[in-house]
Design a protein with these regions (language model features):
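Residues within the DNA-recognition helix of helix-turn-helix
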Residues: 33-43
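Short alpha-helical "packing" element that flanks the helix-turn-helix/winged-helix DNA-binding module
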Residues: 10-17, 69
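Helix-turn-helix DNA-binding elements, focusing on the entry/boundary residues of the two helices
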Residues: 22-23, 41, 55
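Short helix-boundary/capping micro-motifs
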Residues: 16-31
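Alpha-helical residues within the helix-turn-helix
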Residues: 28, 46, 67
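A short LG(V/I)-centered, amphipathic sequence patch enriched
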Residues: 45-62
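The N-cap/first-turn positions of alpha helices
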Residues: 7-10, 34, 66, 73
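Alpha-helical linker/hinge and terminal dimerization helices associated
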Residues: 47-48, 69-85
Length: 85
């Protein structure tokens, strides 16, 4: 089946969660709800086949896989931005 396809909005959501370390703050920055953020993260984790974020009621932090994926995710967004500029 090959590599999983990634969409820009989902990757942007992941980067926002990683940067803000908060679903609520990421949602505010992206103009959506924490519930929508959670759904998009679950979709991305399913596509990649790994957990990117470790969540507790009071803590959001990157998993080992999430830390590894963060720079490529940022590069993906930057490449998109260059392509449409």
């Amino acid at each position: 089946m090959g590599r999983p396809l990634l969409d820009l909005e989902t990757v942007q959501t992941y980067v926002a969660i990683a940067e803000f370390q908060s679903f609520t703050k990421a949602a505010e920055a992206l103009g959506t709800t924490p519930g929508a953020i959670s759904v998009m993260l679950k979709r991305l984790e399913a596509r990649l086949g790994c957990k990117l974020i470790e969540r507790t009621p009071r803590l959001v932090r990157l998993s080992a896989q999430g830390a590894t994926f963060l720079n490529p995710a940022r590069e993906f967004i930057a490449a998109h931005d260059r392509a449409v500029a």
